[in-house]
């Protein structure tokens, strides 16, 4: 078994779209009219919130903007990730620090998306 996708709630579609595309390099994918997702290789981040039509009413208590905690793999040295974040005007809240990840030990930095969700970049190099 493996993970297929995650869901993130956003409060402002345009602002989040720019962040996830420009800062994290996501591909914007329209799943159906009004339903969007960010794709990172073979992983997908579905988007809920204002300006995005819900696919179903399956989530009785939806995730609120700013309540997510996601980790992305950074391909390259973690110092380059810090430089990338700083170039986009983002503050690193913690790191670089050693962390265990899905592939073993790595080095991580933590920062926030526009809604306050905690994001992590981990490098295994």
Language-model-derived ranges and their functions:
Residues 1-2, 62-67, 102-103:
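Short glycine-enriched loop/turn motifs at secondary-structure junctions
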Residues 1-14, 68-70, 125:
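N-terminal beta-strand motif that seeds the catalytic metal site of vicinal oxygen chelate
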């Amino acid at each position: 078994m493996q993970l297929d996708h995650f869901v993130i709630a956003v409060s402002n579609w345009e602002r989040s779209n720019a962040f996830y595309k420009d800062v994290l390099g996501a591909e914007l994918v329209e799943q159906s009219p009004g339903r969007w997702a960010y794709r990172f290789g073979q992983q997908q981040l579905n988007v809920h919130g204002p300006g995005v039509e819900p696919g179903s009413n399956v989530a009785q208590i939806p995730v609120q903007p700013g309540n997510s905690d996601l980790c992305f793999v950074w391909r390259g040295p973690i110092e380059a990730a810090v430089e990338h974040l700083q170039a986009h005007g983002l503050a690193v809240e913690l790191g670089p620090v050693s962390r265990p990840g899905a592939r073993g030990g790595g080095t991580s930095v933590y920062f926030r998306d526009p809604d306050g969700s905690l994001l992590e970049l981990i490098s295994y190099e």
